[in-house]
UniProtKB/Swiss-Prot annotation:
This is NADH-ubiquinone oxidoreductase chain 3. Core subunit of the mitochondrial membrane respiratory chain NADH dehydrogenase (Complex I) that is believed to belong to the minimal assembly required for catalysis. Complex I functions in the transfer of electrons from NADH to the respiratory chain. The immediate electron acceptor for the enzyme is believed to be ubiquinone. The chain crosses the membrane at residues 7-27, 87-107. Keywords: Electron transport, Membrane, Mitochondrion, NAD, Respiratory chain, Translocase, Transmembrane, Transmembrane helix, Transport, Ubiquinone. It comes from the Eukaryota. It holds the Pfam family Oxidored_q4. It is a multi-pass membrane protein.
Length: 118
C-alpha cells in the first residue's frame, strides 16, 4: 500500500486543485444586480431576436474547406525549406507531386464555382 500512497494523494489533491477555482466565484458573487446595464445587450445595442439556431448556408462550409487547403501545404513545405543543393531527388519529386495534387484540387474547386458568391 505504501507504494500507491503518492498516487492516492494525487487522486485526492488533483480534483481539489481544479474544483476550488471553479467554486470560488459562486462563494464571492452576488445574485442581485444593482446595475441594469449589466443585463443589456453588449456593444451592438440591439436586443437579440429570432431563433439562435438558424440554418447555415452550405456555401459557408465550401469556403471553409477552401481555407483548409493551405494548412497542410504550409506544414509539409517546412521540411522542404533547405538549400536546393541539399534536397535529394526523392524529396524534390515528392514535394512536386504534393503541390500538383493541391493544384489539381484547387483548380477543381475553382471550376466547380465553390468560391463564387451569389
Amino acid at each position: 500500500m505504501s507504494e500507491f500512497a503518492p498516487i492516492c494523494i494525487y487522486l485526492v489533491i488533483s480534483p481539489l486543485v481544479s474544483l476550488i477555482p471553479l467554486g470560488l466565484p459562486f462563494l464571492f458573487s452576488s445574485n442581485s444586480s444593482t446595475y441594469p446595464e449589466k443585463s443589456s445587450a453588449y456593444e451592438c445595442g440591439l436586443d437579440p431576436s429570432g431563433d439562435a439556431r438558424s440554418r447555415v448556408d452550405i456555401r459557408f462550409y465550401l469556403v471553409s474547406i477552401l481555407f483548409i487547403i493551405p494548412d497542410p501545404e504550409v506544414t509539409f513545405s517546412f521540411p522542404w525549406a533547405v538549400p536546393p543543393n541539399k534536397i535529394d531527388p526523392f524529396g524534390s519529386w515528392s514535394m512536386m507531386a504534393f503541390l500538383l495534387i493541391l493544384t489539381i484540387g484547387s483548380l477543381y474547386e475553382w471550376k466547380r464555382g465553390a468560391s463564387d458568391r451569389e
